[in-house]
Amino acid sequence: MASTEIMTVNMGPQHPSTHGVLRLVVELDGEIIQKITPHIGYLHRGVEKLSEHRTYHQTIPLTDRLDYLAPMHNNLGYVLAVEKLLGIEVPERAQTIRVILAELTRLKSHLVWVACHALDIGAMTVFIYAFREREMVMSLYEKISGARMTSSYFRVGGLSSDVYDGFEKDVREIVDTFPGHFDTYEGLLTKNTIWLNRTVGNGVISAEDAIDYGITGPALRGSGVDWDLRRDNPYSGYEKYQFKVPVGEKCDTFDRYKVRLVEMREAVNIIRQALDSLKPGPVLADAPQVTYPPKENVYNTIEGLIHHFKIASEGFPVPEGEVYQGVENPKGELGYYIVSDGGNKPYRMRIRPPSFVNLGAIEKMAKGSMIADLVAVIGTLDIVLGEIDR
């Protein structure tokens, strides 16, 4: 009986298909994957520990740098958790704007995913088109927050400021033009023979296994599990919006691709509904002990200046307790577990990053496949190392 020689291959930490500094130790029998061991931590910055030494407001910029392709989702989950501890109500206008920006962020993130996923498999045209469309959302980000990626736009109690004049017009231009671009992507990929050969039947994980591994987001729905936090555990007024939750049937890479394409169309649908319901009003809660005063008060009254200085320098106390808040980030469930001891800083903050959990299932998805197909499996998970390593 011939002996089998197992060959070990290092994929990364500097490899274009890992989309960051991820190292995979792959054991092969010929070209067939037998085992995958992920090595992570190259981008570790200690965000959870850093938050224990910063006030609740000062932690917001740290969240931007988790999934840096979806910063406003990172902000949203964090501020919702703190608001739940404080027991404050966010104004309706602020909630609606949060939903609009969260769904625009979903579009922006999924555009990067389809661009890089297609490029990994050899479809360069889609990469160029998707980044062209993404630039429209990036420009809007810059107009509204002053930054293209690390926006830090959401605040505990609402938003840092109201949207600019012309915001609604810019958003409507995006939602009116994007569906046609989605048709283009599908025309280039969905029935493409090479694309089908690389994705259909590849990276299969059953619904039961997906649940056991704790997978969430499009990767879970691609396995046929009908679960979406926006619908099943709504926040920020998502219960007011009508949208479909797409699910797959064959639990493979192609199904996860189809789920994300439908999600982009549904994001456009949600944004349209939110724009139609956007009404004038305040964008910060009426909670002076937590929120910053209006700029005109800071510049023109000593009371406003002192108020601003106290919150900026000392923060605000949060009642003793603990809370968990999850949001439907483009990659899956992003969760914040915060423990407060009654002070102005988190006693402990634990982040549940979807990419970290989803990456744990990569061996289950890819074992028995060819090593060439591993690139497609990594792409279909849509991982970001910023939130994996934290």
UniProtKB/Swiss-Prot annotation:
Top-level taxon of the source organism: Bacteria
Catalytic activity: a quinone + NADH + 5 H(+)(in) = a quinol + NAD(+) + 4 H(+)(out)
Subunit structure and binding partners: NDH-1 is composed of 14 different subunits. Subunits NuoB, C, D, E, F, and G constitute the peripheral sector of the complex.
Coarse class of the protein's main subcellular location: membrane
Gene encoding the protein: nuoD
GO CC list: plasma membrane
PROSITE patterns named among the record's database cross-references: COMPLEX1_49K
Similarity comment: family membership: Belongs to the complex I 49 kDa subunit family.
Localization per Swiss-Prot or TrEMBL: Cell inner membrane
Stated name of the protein: NADH-quinone oxidoreductase subunit D
EC number: 7.1.1.-
Lineage: Bacteria, Pseudomonadati, Thermodesulfobacteriota, Desulfuromonadia, Geobacterales
Molecular function terms, GO-annotated: NAD binding; NADH:ubiquinone reductase (non-electrogenic) activity; quinone binding
PANTHER family named among the record's database cross-references: NADH DEHYDROGENASE [UBIQUINONE] IRON-SULFUR PROTEIN 2, MITOCHONDRIAL, NADH-UBIQUINONE OXIDOREDUCTASE 49 KDA SUBUNIT
Membrane topology: Peripheral membrane protein
Keywords (A to Z) from UniProt: Cell inner membrane, Cell membrane, Membrane, NAD, Quinone, Translocase, Transport, Ubiquinone
Described function: NDH-1 shuttles electrons from NADH, via FMN and iron-sulfur (Fe-S) centers, to quinones in the respiratory chain. The immediate electron acceptor for the enzyme in this species is believed to be ubiquinone. Couples the redox reaction to proton translocation (for every two electrons transferred, four hydrogen ions are translocated across the cytoplasmic membrane), and thus conserves the redox energy in a proton gradient.
Species this protein is from: Geobacter metallireducens (strain ATCC 53774 / DSM 7210 / GS-15)
